[in-house]
Amino acid sequence: MGPGRRGNGIGGPGAPRLGGLRRGGRRGGRQGVAAPLGHGRPRLAGRRRGGPPASGKEPSDSGLPRGRRRGSRQQWQQSRPPGDLGVAPQAFQWARAGGRGSGAGRAGGEGVDAGRGVPELQHRGGGGEPGRWQWGGRRQRSSSRRSGGEGGEEAEGSGVGAGEGETVQHFPLARPKSLMQKLQCSFQTSWLKDFPWLRYSNDTGLMFCGWCQTTPEDVGSVDLPQVGHDELSRGTRNYKKTLLLRHHVSTEHKLHEANAQVLGSQACVTVDGSAVDKPDASEGCLLVGNESEIPSEEGYCDFNSRPNENSYCYQLLRQLDEQRKKDILCDVSIVVSGKIFKAHKNILVAGSRFFKTLYCVSNKESPNQNNTTHLDIAAVQGFSVILDFLYSGNLVLTSQNAIEVMTVASYLQMSEVVQTCRNFIKDALNISIKSEAPESVVVDYNNRKPVSRDGLTSSRDQKIASFWATRNLTNLASNIKIENDGCNVDEGQIENYQMNDSNWVQDGSPELAENESQGKTKVFIWNNMASQETGKARRKNQTTKRFVYNIPPNSETIVEDCSVLQPPVAYPEENKALLIKEEPVSDLDGALLSGPDGDRTMNTNLLAEACSSQDAGDAAGASHDFKYGLMPGTSSDFKYGLLPSTSNDFKYGLLPGAPNDFKYGLLPESWPTQEPWENGDSSLIMNKLKCPHCSYVAKYRRTLKRHLLIHSGVRSFKCEICGKMFTRREHVKRHSLVHKKDKKYKCMVCKKIFMLAASVGIKHGSRRYGVCMDCVDKSQPGGQESIDQGQDTEFPRDEEYEENEGVEPDEELAEDGQDQSDAPRWDEPGGAYVSG
């Protein structure tokens, strides 16, 4: 009995184990004598010629040498696992699961020693690569193939001879070749669906953009070192996807989007650079540039072979934009504040409902319509952004143009753009500036750009541009200096007033003590240089200012809503000039200047250059040049909110003066050096709440503020039914009763019902009382004069006017006709009480 090729004869180490016995033999020779073995897992040898078939049936004796057939059958029965019925021993062999795309290789040679009982063994020889050995159960026999020629793939240590082929188990890919390949398979199925431009390099293990050759690590940090596949493993999955999203929405990526190559129109390129035919998507390969193919368990569809849905739209809009810039086939000219914009009517009609109504509806009525359209807007920059948006689909919003773009979009009836601008401004309001605010920032109000001390725009100042452009001045907590910009002060345009700091500064203010101790002289300067603009602009005589914001670290002092917002400024005893520079600007400039975020009202230091008393005296007597609201006031000429103290913060009438000379915020010529209540002069106290335009004296500051709106001529409240404008909200409520059919008024004393309000009310100023004339005569024998004297005690008053005593006659109510009463009303007898 000769020894096996790897064994040493009987029980050699190279002999296969069968049922706890070791036997040795030669390929094609006789069986060796079995020897007991007390260790190791029972392993099945490969079939010898004529051995048990793969079907699991008992082998026949015809294939064995004479005299040995019965013994081999007994040994085969002993090798069957207990409890398993009808399963061939080949089903329990250790099958190899190596290889990449073509399955397990063939073992065309002898196996290594199997006596150690370790499952992680490898074949020597054959076409396959080293791989893992797995136990194949009966449920894993899903695929098989026939192998002929040199012999089939066998278990380790078998000495099976060559000859006819045999059925051998094969299994799908168990795991990738390396960690790099495993990560690639995981990101194929998810990220490539979201980012069709994403590519993966087998050489470096890095992801990169196939359109602009940018790795996600380069997007996050340009200084990030490239260290192979470790970059792919570093960081969380969400972090890497965030980098991909950031690059996906970047401007650089969008510029290369049009240059993305469609793989379907090109040949695939292998690693060595040779051109091959495009493979089928089901083969599970990804060919990118000079990268090798990457297998996938479930196949991969090349997303780059799909046409880009936006590429045609992008190319079309880009061509139209080039035609617009070169004035090719432009059929309309848009004139905005004297500047001409060439455009195509088709693009304008498709993007704006305003132009659609103008060119489609109006064109039918007037076929001979001119090709020039004048827009009644003054925001040239905003219209330019909107026009670029119509031709590109990209809306470029910055902190400098957000409000202008929103205004133009509202005028052109582009609701989506308006909503986008609102969201942009809302997000800008949430920016906190306190940690980044410099000590001094110069804001050029013409361009609304922060300028540094040397006149150049700094990168740090640009960070807060959105903040300055979206706050209103009522929240300003800064020291404002209005620069003269080297302009000479014209004579005849300056008004001289003597100012005293005791009436301006709050008690206990730290700024007051500092200013008084240092003896600073600060004057608020205004130079009236407004020019009359021509054209169809809705707003004329507008002003522009150049402010310097000096933001101290901790100079915020919150003031109550009803308190006086007073600038803590120390003025000298001699006369100084009140000058402010004024230049023409667009109609939107009054809405953008802003201050620090989050605070309601602050102390405001008005810092300006001092003018000599001689210059101020020469320029005196020009009060008619000043319009309402040069200092915190309200007027149609003064764009509300340019100065930090609006009507909510500055209380009119606190500065006493002659009615003819006192113009909203201008300081009177005669300024008292002592508080009026210190001398006990009650008349001066009452004059503090006296209207400068009429003889009305208010009892409360808020009443005087509301009274001054009548002189301003501003009507902010509109009737929803007829569109009539009113100065106050309560006037609109009373006016709305005119449009109601059933109006029944009830006397508050005798409960008698009247159909007309004039029959119930007593007109005294703007006050109406729900008491009929009969009850008035009974309760007040003195008549109307007694009513005027005792009106505070005899009649119940409307809660809405409890502080508004003796208000002047209301001009708006006289136009209402039949509704001349402020009497309360009952809809039905015994019904609910309705207050006017």
UniProtKB/Swiss-Prot annotation:
Primary localization: nucleus
State the residue spans of region: Disordered: 1-165, 781-836
Where located? Nucleus
Metal-binding recorded as keyword: yes
* Cross-referenced InterPro entries: BTB/POZ_dom, SKP1/BTB/POZ_sf, Znf_C2H2_sf, Znf_C2H2_type, ZnFinger_BTB_dom_contain
Q: Compositional bias (Basic residues) at which positions?
A: 40-50
Domain BTB span(s) in chain numbering: 330-399
| Parts of the chain that traverse the membrane | none
Q: Which GO terms describe its molecular function?
A: DNA binding; DNA-binding transcription repressor activity, RNA polymerase II-specific; RNA polymerase II transcription regulatory region sequence-specific DNA binding; telomeric DNA binding; zinc ion binding
Pfam families found in the cross-reference section = BTB (PF00651), zf-C2H2 (PF00096)
| Glycyl lysine isopeptide (Lys-Gly) (interchain with G-Cter in SUMO2), cross-linked positions | 182, 434, 449, 463, 536, 639, 651, 663
Keyword terms of this UniProt record: DNA-binding, Isopeptide bond, Metal-binding, Methylation, Nucleus, Phosphoprotein, Repeat, Transcription, Transcription regulation, Ubl conjugation, Zinc, Zinc-finger
Please list the tissues where expression of this protein has been recorded: Expressed ubiquitously.
Residues modified as Omega-N-methylarginine are 100
Is this entry keyworded Transcription?
A: yes
- In residue numbers, the zinc fingers (C2H2-type) are 689-711, 717-739
| GO BP of this protein | negative regulation of transcription by RNA polymerase II; regulation of transcription by RNA polymerase II
Q: Which residues carry this modification: Phosphoserine?
A: 147, 531
User: What GO cellular component is one of the record's annotations?
Assistant: chromosome, telomeric region
Q: Where is the composition biased (Polar residues)?
A: 781-792
- Show the SUPFAM superfamilies listed in the entry: beta-beta-alpha zinc fingers, POZ domain
Q: List the disulfide bonds.
A: none
Functional description taken from the UniProt entry: May be involved in transcriptional regulation.
Name this polypeptide is given: Zinc finger and BTB domain-containing protein 10
- Which source organism? Rattus norvegicus (Rat)
